[in-house]
Amino acid sequence: MAPSVQAEVDEGANHTNGFPEFNASRRRQPPPKLKKPVPHYRHLVRWNKYSIPESIEEQQLNQDLLICRQLLNLFFNANMAEAESILAKGQIPVTENQVDLHAFDGLQGTASTNLLQKTLDALGLTLEDIKDDSDDLPSETSSSAASSKDGKKSPSTTPSIAPSTHGKKNKVKKEKEVKSMYYGLGGAIIQGLRALVTFDPEEIEKGVEAFEQAAKAADKLRKGTIIGLGSVKAVGSFVVGTIGAGSFRGMNRVQKHAELIYAESTILRSLLSVLYHVDVWMVFEECINLRHAFTIIQGLKSYMDSVESELRAGKNIDHHQIDEHLVSGVTLSYSLYNIIISFMPDIIVKMLQFIGFPSDRDWGMAMLAACGDWDPMAPPETPAQHAERLASSANDGIRRQFCDMVPIIFQVIVSSFIPMNHVDLNYAQMINDYNLELYPNSPIFLFFKGRHLQVTSKFDDAVSTYKSAQAKIQPRWHNINHIFVFEELMIAMTRSDHETACENSRQLLKESRWSKCCFRYLTVITGYERGVKSERKKIDTLMGKVESGMQTVAGMNLFFETFCARKSKRYLKEGHLLLPSYDFMLLWNTFDMMPLDVLGEALAKISTEVSRLQGLLPQKMKDRENQPLAPKDQTMEAFSGGYLSSIFSNKNALIKDSKVEGYENFYDDYCLAFFLQGVVAYHLAFFPEAAFDREKCELALKSFDTVFRYAPLIKDDTYTYYFTHYYKAKIWIHQGRLDDAQARFKYLLGLSNTNLLGLPALVGGKGKNSLEIMVLFKVHSGLLEIETARAAASGYASSIMSSK
């Protein structure tokens, strides 16, 4: 072992050299300490859904809310097509007395067929009524633009999401004007979901138009005469503009809902529009719209804060007529602003904070938990408590399930890609189990269940759950299957099950248009790893089409497509790829999900390639390996007085000595192999809830040092250099060397420009990092992890001092 590696491991204060004897659990981490109290708006609900108000408008709102809530139940419980058909029939006038509102009681959790029939009975409809309408609805499978088996592009497949006729909306049938703001929003959300699962430019444009119609329907019911409210769109409100709580006190219940719907429709339209437009200036315009919508959401929150203050003061708040739908809507929107902005780099966060946006992720998550009355640290509920939760009207808010979905998504999906603090998989499972009890046939919550099993390394159970969920998806929503197929593909690649992986990737290439570039590449590498010689010509042909499948979102290329395109160029130039499946897994963090036995198999395969490449290393380069590395910091600056100076002074000699005949990108593969070996060894060393493996930690450090040594010779795959820095900093965090880890993260942030002048490909490379955005997100989360670790250490030290 190299002396520098031994020094890395030997540094420490206790008998484990700073490392814990046992690794922490990935299922549950301590909850965060919040900087401010969390409001509990669910206690403000003072509305009886069965009382008949005097206003016809409010009567209509009550009926629309109850119907849309029930349609949402149908949608979640696998009756997606039927819910869409009922919604498409349009608003039922309350004056016709057609709807039996009491018939909706207790329908959650019933069998799917009974739920549908009882809903139809309550609405005065028959199954034939909605079947007739379903014939006029768009079929999702018809717009999936399936490719032929050899990967040829169909006529509707374009390399960009936006069609070539951008701006000509006459090709898309204009959405009919909607009269009900909730029907309009519901229809727009369904159309937006269809746009996302198909990625069809026409469907995306229809979704944008649908949200515009929903906003118009809500705008007609807004109280625009209130001073400050009508000026939300003014440019002057962009920086510091807000709507005070007093503006909402003068509104009736319908007008408050109109404000909420208007803001939500604006937000969702802007986000969907970003996918559609390729113009960066259009993205800037949508950011302004998001700011305008936020002023409304912030005003509603201020209003509810003032009502909560009245409640704490013992005042009667019945006259405010706050219902669970308004509570769940304000909670969801304001929390998402906090959570999403918090993931952005510090410089962007500070800019957004300057113009009034919040960015407290932990507080946003806690606000969502309060909406559902969830407590991550609470003991399991008693049967009586559970029954009370199911019966509570506060859980009937039309956005209630979305408030539950956000923490589940961040716990079991986002945390797999971006390291997060305070991950609690038990908490996510508790929320998801509750919703599965309400919606046992829901493909959405079954997906979350499967994903939870997947991230906890229970691959067989995860695949079984994914298969079960796919069986419940209706033909009209066939493209949702692709989400499950992709997860099964990742599991198959993790297990080196090349047959299944090849089958799944071909299905995605044939049926899905999410990313033709990515799916072509996956089809190629799974076929390549399967090793069937008769398919080699098809593989070569399809690899030549990878780059042409790239698309743009908000005027920018997607990082994973850039990665696939660069790898395809390498393959076409050299005729081979090194460990392409493991290389691709880095993009989706599947190493974090691998069980110990699979990690062991991966290490054996990667180590075999490492040994093979070591045999190809020129002898003169092996002689150079005796030169000592920098004793501590392995950054390029640390080399400036040693190794790099010898490179610059003997550049021609170094190029000659390092050359491997017939292997132009040898050092790209050499560093990649050692990097992958280090990553797998890292995960073995710090496998959750297992004993710390010192030997694997030493192997990881040794592998990373090898990457640092040969990084100046990398020509294309410079991402290995940056990720190596990241994983070395992660080891230091485990060891308690927080200052060193922080310095390494800040060093990486200093390299986050796209040109990377002089770093690290100093000899002949381009110096670009195709996975830069991933590095930035990981480093940002790593800095937050260091802050949390310091706070925990400070709290522990304080408790020790107080006990003395």
Language-model segments: which ranges?
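Fungal intrinsically disordered, low-complexity serine/threonine- and proline-rich regulatory regions
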Residues: 1-37, 134-166, 798-804
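Solenoid-like repeat scaffolds
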Residues: 54-57, 88-95, 171, 353-358, ...
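Generic helix N-cap/helix-start motif at coil->alpha-helix transitions
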Residues: 61-66, 400-402, 439-446, 477-485, ...
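Boundary/linker segments of alpha-helical solenoid repeat arrays
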Residues: 95-103, 218-226, 230, 308-310, ...
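Eukaryotic alpha-helical solenoid repeat scaffolds
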Residues: 400, 525, 529-714, 718-725, ...
